[in-house]
Amino acid sequence: MRNPQLNKHGELQHLLTIDGLPRSILTAILDTAAPFTEVAEREVKKLPLLRGKSIFNLFFENSTRTRTTFEIAAKRLSADVVNLNVSTSSAAKGESLLDTVDNLSAMQADMFVVRHAASGAPFLIAQHLFATGRDHIHVVNAGDGRHAHPTQGLLDMYTIRHFKRDFTNLTIAIVGDVLHSRVARSQIGALTTLGVPEVRVIGPKTLLPTDVERLGVRVFHDIREGLRGVDVVMMLRLQNERMNGALLPTPQEFYKVWGLTAEKLALAKPDAIVMHPGPMNRGVEIDSSVADGAQAVILPQVTFGIAVRMAVMSMLAGQQGSK
């Protein structure tokens, strides 16, 4: 079966999900991102790799970090960036997603960066472009429903590699609302592909998928037991906007039992790092003393996110787009 993310040469054509991508491609993205971190330290933070390319950010869900870092990344690569304001676009008047894509394609788009509440929306766009002979336009998934958030997963891998160097001797814990988290799915897929020997998932039963163990993770409902001896703690926020009346803990109950405090973090290795994809709910999934503490690498995640998104866009449109 054709992998819709790869072209006929096996090169990355779209980034829709981490699932199905070989370790070589994930490693290539991380390796490509490394020199881009240095661009931020320059007086002139510009490279000409995407000069003349038009990138459309189609965000049908709210976003701060993801949308902003995609825009910064594209501009640092010298691309022309168009941000679609969904609330004032024709989508608000009932225009279908694919009609929107068709019209923007007619404006000579080179790439769509898509965030959508519907799982599979970026796949639908990529398939439509292929079926209509416009698969030279690249699609990047910036988060689709509960399904996937591949660039977040990749920037998390870059952060781990930066601070821990080697994936193959780590124990990593993912804590919180895994059930509703597209980030967790991308994290688990990337960690497994990159050779992490033990991935732990920690949370209440009502916030974990019933089949989560088939992903090759160890499940813990006791956070203290789950954090014992880990190298990396990856926190997730409660996805209140995706919950539909399930038997769920209140924010106060969640914090008391599963919130990451300094006392709980002390059970991890002394040099463990703490990560969070944002936005953080302080006093719910993480205590401020931990979020602002010496072991937190939450702000470096944001910084590295720009470099990783530069890497993805340059690999898509900068190199292969001209073939």
Curated annotation (Swiss-Prot):
The record's comment on protein family reads: Belongs to the aspartate/ornithine carbamoyltransferase superfamily. ATCase family.
- What is the protein named? Aspartate carbamoyltransferase catalytic subunit
Entries under InterPro entries matching the protein: Asp/Orn_carbamoyltranf_P-bd, Asp/Orn_carbamoylTrfase, Asp/Orn_carbamoylTrfase_sf, Asp_carbamoyltransf, Asp_carbamoyltransf_Asp/Orn-bd
Q: Which species does the entry assign this protein to?
A: Aromatoleum aromaticum (strain DSM 19018 / LMG 30748 / EbN1) (Azoarcus sp. (strain EbN1))
Enzymatic reactions: carbamoyl phosphate + L-aspartate = N-carbamoyl-L-aspartate + phosphate + H(+)
Any Pfam family from its record, for instance, is: OTCace_N
Gene Ontology biological process terms, A to Z = 'de novo' pyrimidine nucleobase biosynthetic process; 'de novo' UMP biosynthetic process; amino acid metabolic process
| Complex and partners | Heterododecamer (2C3:3R2) of six catalytic PyrB chains organized as two trimers (C3), and six regulatory PyrI chains organized as three dimers (R2).
Q: What gene is this protein translated from?
A: pyrB
Its cellular-component GO annotations read:
cytosol
Function field: Catalyzes the condensation of carbamoyl phosphate and aspartate to form carbamoyl aspartate and inorganic phosphate, the committed step in the de novo pyrimidine nucleotide biosynthesis pathway.
Q: Which EC number(s) does the record attach to this protein?
A: 2.1.3.2
PROSITE patterns from the xrefs? CARBAMOYLTRANSFERASE (PS00097)
Q: Which UniProt keywords apply?
A: Pyrimidine biosynthesis, Transferase
One GO MF term attached to the UniProt entry: aspartate carbamoyltransferase activity
- Kindly list the organism's lineage: Bacteria, Pseudomonadati, Pseudomonadota, Betaproteobacteria, Rhodocyclales
Please give the pathway this protein is involved in.
Answer: Pyrimidine metabolism; UMP biosynthesis via de novo pathway; (S)-dihydroorotate from bicarbonate: step 2/3
Superkingdom of the source? Bacteria
Query: Where is carbamoyl phosphate annotated to bind?
Result: 65-66, 115, 149, 152, 278-279
Q: Kindly list the positions annotated as binding L-aspartate.
A: 93, 182, 237
Q: Which SUPFAM superfamilies match?
A: Aspartate/ornithine carbamoyltransferase
